[in-house]
């Protein structure tokens, strides 16, 4: 058999004759125009404070790819689309910030300063204008004060008086090459060492012996003055009293970071008693260095990339700082080594040991009344995830929920965590049933209960403003569509709001009467729509992104077929069959990358170049199939983890079975089947060509993964 390994397969096909429908020429050059053909997707939609306007990022298909996105605005009903000027953009509130419990004001950071928006008048007030970076503002429960971070510490500001209170004193670790501090400490002035330039510190100008003698005589003279002169005694007493008061007010101990410690995140508790600091310790991992030969300087420059798998990674602990005393308590997650039992999927029992297990802890999530806190923790090996109740006073935790997976914890919305309206339960996402669903766990005691269930996935979730209901995007109707739903805040049936087949990514307006919907379909790129937030409401299209000639071609709404696998499983695939199909023609299989990604569905694919290339292949007589092999997203936990510790196993089997399906069911010549893919798809292509040479005649491995020792650290499987 004549077999050829071609990198890439596209090179053998780039001479395809132009196929036209209307005025569009189906050529390699045309489909590789990228956004110049399919347009730039609108992104990051957000509503105005009064829900009357929608803002989003977008560019015209004629804009250069390296040009920044522009900010556009439209009215609530989708009319009045226009690009905002730079001056108008500067007047917009930031996309992220915090709203007070009274819903009256919105505080945010912009250009390293703080601003507050009055939701009743629309007026914006600048709160800070400094050379320091103010960030992460949040309202306190009284809605009159905010806390924020500046210079690695937490501050509280009154919006009425402007009074500023520092809530923590976190001192960064000194650089490793910093000079030693003079004996005089912070008061050492400009002096260095014991005998030179002591300034106002204790260093003095003379040597150690001279300083000692001078100090003794000065002390005698000072005491004599106090004994002989009453005015001096009174001044000294007043000074001592003032110093005592100052020390009483400044009794908070500093939290001195040591060595290579850094603070990644800060948070103030609602009662203002504690500051939480995520303290990171870097591991011994070395970055992958990539040479940049084309630089602005004309010299070769190093680009530090990610570290490799197996390297020691950074660890993070949560410190609890008492805002009055400065005393530090560390969160104790209670998980010790050993903690292993991989015999089945059940949660392993914890065995006592002296060494803490390495957990990555999140920051506390507080109940609405500010009285209770929970945190999430994930083991470094990603096999376990916990939800803990936290006692801020002691740092002790109590387990509320625990998930264990012999492969790795994952799935959509895996980091979801919040409080139910009753403030007695927390909601979270879990694949414990085999599919990603929403659960509620009681804070005090008891087992978690399922809020959603079935052989489908909840892809993302958020609460309504009054927490009376959930808004969800889910695949309830089947794995190939993502619809937008609402559900009672206590669980129950789902009501479908945005229901056209395809993918819906929804942003709800502040008044919750309207939604902005980023919607796409198999042969329709993502566009922005607006609609009322009610059952089966009609959508109004706001944007048109592709070049006009894109719509001149009849892009295929590729049917989804089920490929029978050797173990009895049905593997989803998209089929591209030429209109002029002749039995015995060639076949091709596209293998998507990323591994954990879904490419067989009714949305516009992120692999749109490959989607259009499938049309070129069809025009040349190829029957093409795209496969969501084992390890792909969208089909539950077991599908996701089926390749654990054996990449190139079941995933490759699915590709081989797809080739057999093309021959047996679609009339393709089994001796004329090739495959191609990039990244993980390139890896599968290499595995196929080297281990299945009797199945595949040609292969194109683009940017392939060829050595798993070089994969990204903490990347599962």
Locate the predicted segments by residue.
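Serine-hydrolase catalytic core recognition
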Residues: 333, 370, 376, 467, ...
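Beta-propeller folds
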Residues: 7-8, 12-514, 520-531, 535-537, ...
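Positively charged n-region of N-terminal signal peptides that target proteins for export
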Residues: 1-5
């Amino acid at each position: 058999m004549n077999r050829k390994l071609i990198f890439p397969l596209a090179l053998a096909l780039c001479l395809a004759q132009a196929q036209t429908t209307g005025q569009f020429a189906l050529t390699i050059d045309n489909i590789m125009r990228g956004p110049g053909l399919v347009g730039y997707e609108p992104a990051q939609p957000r509503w105005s404070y009064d829900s009357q306007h929608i803002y989003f990022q977008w560019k015209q298909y004629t804009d250069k790819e390296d040009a920044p996105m522009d900010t556009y605005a439209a009215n609530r009903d989708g009319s009045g689309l226009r690009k905002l000027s730079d001056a108008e953009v500067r007047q917009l509130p930031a996309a992220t910030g915090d709203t007070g419990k009274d819903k009256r004001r919105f505080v945010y950071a912009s250009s390293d300063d703080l601003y507050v928006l009055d939701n009743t008048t629309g007026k914006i007030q600048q709160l800070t204008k400094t050379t320091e970076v103010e960030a992460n503002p949040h309202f306190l429960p009284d809605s009159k004060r905010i806390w924020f971070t500046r210079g690695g510490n937490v501050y509280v500001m009154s919006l009425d008086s402007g009074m500023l209170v520092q809530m923590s004193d976190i001192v960064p670790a000194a650089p490793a090459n910093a000079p030693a501090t003079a004996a005089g400490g912070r008061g050492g002035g400009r002096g260095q060492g014991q005998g030179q330039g002591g300034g106002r510190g204790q260093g003095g100008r003379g040597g150690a012996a001279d300083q000692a003698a001078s100090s003794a005589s000065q002390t005698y003279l000072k005491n004599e003055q106090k004994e002989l002169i009453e005015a001096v005694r009174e001044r000294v007493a007043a000074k001592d009293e003032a110093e005592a008061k100052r020390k009483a007010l400044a009794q908070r101990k500093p939290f001195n970071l040591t060595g290579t410690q850094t603070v990644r995140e800060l948070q103030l508790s609602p009662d203002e008693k504690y500051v939480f600091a995520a303290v990171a310790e870097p591991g011994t991992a070395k970055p992958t260095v990539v040479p940049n030969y084309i630089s602005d300087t004309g010299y070769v420059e190093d680009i530090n990339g990610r570290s490799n798998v197996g390297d020691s990674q950074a660890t993070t602990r949560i410190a609890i700082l008492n805002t009055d005393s400065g005393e530090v308590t560390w969160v104790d997650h209670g998980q010790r080594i050993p903690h292993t039992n991989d015999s089945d999927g059940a949660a392993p029992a914890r065995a006592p040991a002296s060494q803490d297990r390495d957990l990555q802890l999140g920051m506390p999530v507080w109940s609405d009344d500010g009285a209770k806190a929970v945190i999430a923790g994930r083991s470094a090996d990603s096999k376990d995830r916990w939800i803990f109740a936290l006692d801020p006073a002691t740092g002790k935790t109590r387990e509320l929920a625990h998930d264990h997976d012999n492969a790795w914890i994952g799935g959509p919305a895996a980091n979801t965590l919040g409080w139910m309206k009753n403030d007695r339960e927390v909601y979270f996402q879990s694949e414990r049933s085999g599919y990603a669903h929403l659960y509620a766990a009681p804070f005090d005691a008891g087992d978690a209960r399922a809020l959603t269930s079935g052989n489908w996935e909840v892809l993302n979730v958020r609460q309504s403003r009054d927490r009376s209901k959930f808004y969800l995007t889910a695949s309830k109707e089947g794995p190939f569509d993502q619809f937008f739903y609402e559900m009672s805040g206590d669980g129950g049936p789902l009501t479908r709001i945005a229901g056209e087949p395809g993918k819906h990514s929804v942003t709800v307006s502040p008044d919750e009467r309207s939604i902005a919907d980023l919607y796409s379909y198999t042969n329709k790129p993502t566009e922005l729509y607006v609609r009322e937030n009610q059952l089966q409401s009609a959508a109004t299209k706001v944007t048109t992104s592709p070049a006009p000639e894109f719509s001149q071609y009849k892009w295929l709404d590729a049917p989804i077929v089920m490929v029978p696998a050797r173990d009895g499983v049905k593997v989803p695939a998209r089929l591209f069959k030429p209109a002029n199909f002749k039995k015995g023609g060639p076949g091709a299989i596209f293998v998507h990358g990323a591994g954990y990604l879904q490419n067989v569905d009714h949305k516009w694919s992120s692999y749109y170049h490959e989607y259009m290339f499938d049309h070129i292949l069809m025009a040349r007589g190829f029957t093409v199939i795209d496969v969501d092999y084992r390890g792909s997203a969208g089909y539950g936990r077991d599908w996701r983890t089926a390749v654990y510790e054996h990449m190139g196993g079941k995933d490759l089997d699915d590709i081989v079975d797809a080739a057999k399906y093309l021959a047996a069911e679609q009339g393709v010549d089994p001796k004329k089947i090739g495959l191609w893919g990039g990244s993980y798809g390139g890896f599968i292509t290499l595995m196929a060509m080297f281990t299945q040479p009797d199945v595949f005649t040609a292969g194109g491995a683009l940017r392939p993964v060829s050595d798993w020792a070089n994969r990204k650290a903490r990347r599962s499987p």
